[in-house]
C-alpha cells in the first residue's frame, strides 16, 4: 500500500509542477539560472587566471 501512496504523491507533485512550469514561473527560473551561470562562469575564469599567475608556487 505504501508504494501506491508514493506513486499518487508523485503524481500530484508532477501535475502541480506541470501547471506551474507552463506559466511564467519557468521563464523566471530560466532567467535566474542564466544569471547564476554567468556569475559562476566569471568567478571560475577569475580564479583560473589567478591560479596560473599569482598563486603559482
UniProtKB/Swiss-Prot annotation:
Q: Which residues cross the membrane?
A: 6-26, 35-55
* Superkingdom in the source lineage: Bacteria
Q: What is its main location?
A: membrane
Q: Provide the protein's localization.
A: Cell membrane
Q: Has keyword Nucleus?
A: no
Family membership, please give it. Belongs to the UPF0391 family.
What is the protein's given name? UPF0391 membrane protein RPB_2510
Question: Which taxonomic lineage is given here?
Answer: Bacteria, Pseudomonadati, Pseudomonadota, Alphaproteobacteria, Hyphomicrobiales
Amino acid at each position: 500500500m505504501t508504494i501506491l501512496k508514493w506513486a499518487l504523491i508523485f503524481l500530484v507533485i508532477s501535475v502541480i509542477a506541470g501547471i506551474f512550469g507552463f506559466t511564467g514561473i519557468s521563464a523566471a527560473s530560466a532567467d535566474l539560472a542564466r544569471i547564476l551561470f554567468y556569475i559562476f562562469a566569471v568567478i571560475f575564469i577569475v580564479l583560473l587566471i589567478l591560479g596560473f599567475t599569482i598563486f603559482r608556487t
